[in-house]
From Swiss-Prot:
Protein function: Component of the SWR1 complex which mediates the ATP-dependent exchange of histone H2A for the H2A variant HZT1 leading to transcriptional regulation of selected genes by chromatin remodeling. Involved in chromosome stability.
Protein name as catalogued: SWR1-complex protein 5
Source organism (scientific name): Eremothecium gossypii (strain ATCC 10895 / CBS 109.51 / FGSC 9923 / NRRL Y-1056) (Yeast)
Keyword Transcription belongs to the record: yes
Source domain of life: Eukaryota
Length: 286
């Protein structure tokens, strides 16, 4: 606590304050500031400076030297940026010092062998293509006929004409569907006058019956006939005509007949062996 004293004669203007050091608490003082250093610290700091023990200037002047510190792999310790720059420089210099080496004789022989095999394959491919082209040309040179189909579709008469091979299933179906063979119309004869001049007889429209007999009018296709033609077109497109002929109904019946004959022959052979076995056993018993 601060104990005020009575003013003396020598100091009448100012009052002297005496501090009770034992009972004084600094935190209870109104002017206490915890952020400021204490007076005792200031006094110690001043005493250190005065005695020469304070070496702050020397510590600030001292600088750490990392140039002699080495990593476990050897060399100076580098930062991330230095390592990145070093890596980029190594990548750039990687191809600058690359030297082309001569190709060995073994590699040259393998390359020549591969070239020969490639040329041989190209030659074989060209030969196959040439043979296929000749076969297709021969097929095109085969006799072709024009077939015409007329049928109602969606309420409209549709007429279709196309060239097909005479040996194709579609052509055979079309020829079988024709009820009348086409006949050439006889051209109108010309008459000569006594004077030697030729006159043309005016043409008239022939009757429909004569056109049908002559084959000028094609019969309309029924739904069944159109289905047959569509099936024949599909067979020619897929190329299964020979396969169908091999596995048709007649072929199946022929196979069944052959199997029955084989079974009959096997039964006859079994009966003959059985009869011989019985005769042999009877002779031994007698």
């Amino acid at each position: 606590m601060i104990a005020p004293t009575e003013p003396t004669e020598g100091n009448s203007r100012a009052s002297v304050l005496e501090f009770d050091e034992e009972g004084y608490v600094e935190s209870e003082d109104e002017d206490f500031d915890p952020s400021k250093p204490a007076d005792d610290d200031k006094e110690e700091e001043l005493s250190d400076k005065s005695d020469g023990d304070y070496q702050e200037a020397d510590e600030e002047a001292e600088k750490y030297d990392y140039s002699h510190i080495e990593s476990s792999e050897g060399g100076l310790v580098s930062t991330r940026n230095a390592r990145r720059l070093q890596h980029e420089r190594e990548q750039r210099e990687k191809y600058e010092h690359f030297e082309m080496q001569g190709v060995s004789s073994r590699a040259g022989e393998l390359w020549a062998q591969l070239q020969e095999e490639s040329q041989a394959r190209l030659h074989d491919t060209s030969s196959v293509m040439h043979a296929g082209g000749e076969a297709g040309k021969d097929r095109m040179q085969e006799e072709q006929i024009m077939i015409e189909r007329a049928y109602w579709f969606a309420g409209e008469m549709v007429r279709e004409k196309k060239m097909v091979l005479k040996s194709s299933a579609e052509a055979q179906e079309y020829l079988n569907s024709l009820k009348f063979k086409p006949k050439e119309l006889v051209p109108s004869t010309m008459q000569e006058m006594d004077g030697g001049s030729k006159l043309r007889r005016p043409l008239k429209r022939p009757p429909i019956l004569e056109q049908i007999i002559a084959g000028a009018l094609k019969p309309k296709l029924t739904t069944l006939e159109k289905s047959k033609l569509d099936w024949a077109t599909y067979v020619d497109k897929e190329g299964i005509n020979e396969e169908l002929q091999l596995f048709n109904k007649d072929g199946y019946l022929a196979k069944q007949d052959f199997l029955r004959k084989v079974d009959g022959i096997q039964n006859e052979q079994y009966k003959e062996l059985r009869r011989q076995e019985l005769q042999k056993n009877g002779a031994q018993g007698m």
